[in-house]
């Protein structure tokens, strides 16, 4: 089950990458039905929107659905603090992550868990989707390090550091 939805999140990340954007995709799924409520990818470059991360795009696409207490957010990369806050705010009880290798710390995972949110990190040795997420993010970081830092709030300010 996790592989299917993470594969879709990866496809969305790849879509963002081919549009010269940051390769992060996310899918919000209803646990009871398996229905995809919303999906999206990072849109910083494409839409000039610094808060349109993959998770935010998925939440936006899900619209005004009110019972998110039985959903799972699949994300190709460990969420940043902004997206972590949105996950907590909307009461999403489970987050499945494809890539933590390209994150600089586990702060957001620890925060989610401290709020009672189940966090599942897929193992890239057993999940092809997770391995793909890690490889794509690493490639992007090598090719466009400035854009990677900008997306995580690093920009030109040396006091800021990306969490993810």
Can you describe what each PLM-predicted range is?
Residues 1-21:
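Short, basic/aromatic recognition patches
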Residues 22-24, 70-71:
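Residue-level recognition of the N-termini of beta-strands and the immediately preceding loop/turn
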Residues 10, 14, 32, 131-164:
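Secretory/periplasmic and organellar redox-cofactor proteins
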Residues 24-34:
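Short beta-strand scaffold segments in enzyme catalytic cores
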Residues 22, 35, 49:
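Flexible, active-site-adjacent loop/turn segments at secondary-structure boundaries
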Residues 38-135:
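Zn2+-dependent cytidine deaminase-like catalytic core
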Residues 9, 25, 58:
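Conserved hydrophobic/aromatic pocket- or pore-lining residues that grip, position, or stack substrates
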């Amino acid at each position: 089950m996790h592989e299917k939805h993470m594969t879709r999140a990866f496809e969305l990340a790849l879509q963002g990458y081919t549009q010269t954007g940051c390769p992060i995709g996310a899918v919000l799924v209803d646990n009871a039905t398996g229905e995809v409520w919303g999906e999206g990818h990072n849109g910083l470059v494409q839409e000039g929107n610094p808060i349109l991360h993959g998770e935010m795009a998925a939440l936006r696409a899900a619209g005004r659905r009110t019972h998110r207490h039985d959903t799972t957010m699949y994300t190709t990369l460990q969420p940043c603090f902004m997206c972590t806050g949105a996950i907590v705010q909307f009461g999403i009880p489970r987050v499945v992550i494809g890539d933590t290798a390209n994150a600089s710390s586990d702060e957001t995972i620890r925060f989610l868990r401290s709020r009672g949110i189940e966090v599942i990190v897929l193992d890239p040795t057993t999940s092809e989707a997770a391995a793909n997420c890690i490889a794509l993010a690493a490639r992007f970081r090598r090719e466009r390090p400035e854009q990677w830092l900008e997306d995580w709030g690093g920009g030109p300010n040396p006091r800021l550091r990306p969490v993810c």
